[in-house]
Amino acid sequence: EKMKKNNIFQSSRFFCDVYCFETGQEQKGHVHGDQDKIYLVLEGQGRFSVGNEQRVLGPGEGTFAPAGEAHGVVNHTNARLRVLVFVAPNPA
């Protein structure tokens, strides 16, 4: 089962989603050629990878994935992970 994306807001310049990951769910590593992405953890803990760096982040912590850099998220815990995500510019 895939993690769930809930759109909060979008404009022609950026969008904001909340990603919800249950235990074991992940967003596999991928690259956005022209978009920067910011992850901010709202609830739970997750393993975030950006480029060659991996970090476990919890509530109130975040990371930045610049355009062209591989990034992904794994919920490696037994609790739900909720993440606020900003992407700019909006590819839509």
What do the predicted segments below correspond to?
Residues 34-36, 41-46:
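Glycine- and acidic-residue-biased ligand/ion/polar-headgroup-sensing regions
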Residues 1-29, 35, 86:
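A short glycine-rich, His/Asp/Glu-containing loop-to-beta-strand
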Residues 32-33, 77:
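Short glycine/proline-enriched turns and hinge-like loops at secondary-structure junctions
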Residues 14, 45, 53-55:
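Well-ordered beta-strand scaffold positions
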Residues 26-28, 47, 63, 67-73:
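Histidine-centered metal-chelating micro-motifs
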Residues 43, 51, 86-88:
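Cofactor-binding loop segments of dinucleotide-utilizing enzymes, especially the Rossmann-like FAD-
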Residues 67-91:
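Ligand-binding loop in jelly-roll beta-barrel domains
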